[in-house]
């Protein structure tokens, strides 16, 4: 299909233009590295340009500059120096572990997986503090998670899903590294949070969360 091929060509050029010293948000926009964007850009890169060292660089930049509690920032600036923004989004923080797991799956880079695993574990520990007694994630105040730009959007169900997805990814990391305790802990988290989503967030009539 000519249209699909044309779209693919433009998409690849767009991705290439964003691959500078980091994966930029856009060469003509704010030119920042966003963690949520990095995850998707990296997945496309593994199938196309295979500039995997650039993904590695971005992961280390995020892990190397965190809040005092260990949470990674949602984005960082590259000029005039590398510095994190004061924007912290819970879904983006959790995506650090998922992005690391994807990077390992694409590269087999065990050294980086070992080196950054503690940061991945920490993001899930921080996120786990946001759940109530029913194992449901609590809506935060202000700009606490991204999910989508829609004004007034209730992000609870989506964030519950992000937590389960990322917990599964980080559980994979723990399993690969032989960390049985962390693997079991995350397996339990996945089970409990999935059950809570089905019990409290699922609309039985529509079949949607």
Language-model segment annotations:
Residues 1-129:
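Substrate-binding groove/exosite segments of carbohydrate-active enzymes
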């Amino acid at each position: 299909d000519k249209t699909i091929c044309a779209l693919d060509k433009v998409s690849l050029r767009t991705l290439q233009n964003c691959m500078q010293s980091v994966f930029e948000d856009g060469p003509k926009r704010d030119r920042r590295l966003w963690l949520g964007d990095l995850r998707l850009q990296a997945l496309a890169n593994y199938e196309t340009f295979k500039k995997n060292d650039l993904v590695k660089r971005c992961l280390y930049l995020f892990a190397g500059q965190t809040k005092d509690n260990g949470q990674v920032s949602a984005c960082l600036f590259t000029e005039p120096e590398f510095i994190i923004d004061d924007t912290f989004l819970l879904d983006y923080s959790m995506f650090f572990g998922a992005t690391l797991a994807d990077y390992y799956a694409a590269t087999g880079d065990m050294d980086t997986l070992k080196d950054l695993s503690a940061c991945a574990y920490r993001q899930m520990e921080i996120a786990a503090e946001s759940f109530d007694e029913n194992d449901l994630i609590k809506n935060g105040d202000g700009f606490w998670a991204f999910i989508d730009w829609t004004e007034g959007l209730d992000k609870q169900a989506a964030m519950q899903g992000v937590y389960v997805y990322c917990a599964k990814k980080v559980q994979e990391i723990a399993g690969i590294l032989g960390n049985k305790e962390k693997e079991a802990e995350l397996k339990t988290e996945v089970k409990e949070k999935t059950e809570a989503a089905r019990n409290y967030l699922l609309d039985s009539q529509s079949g949607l969360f």
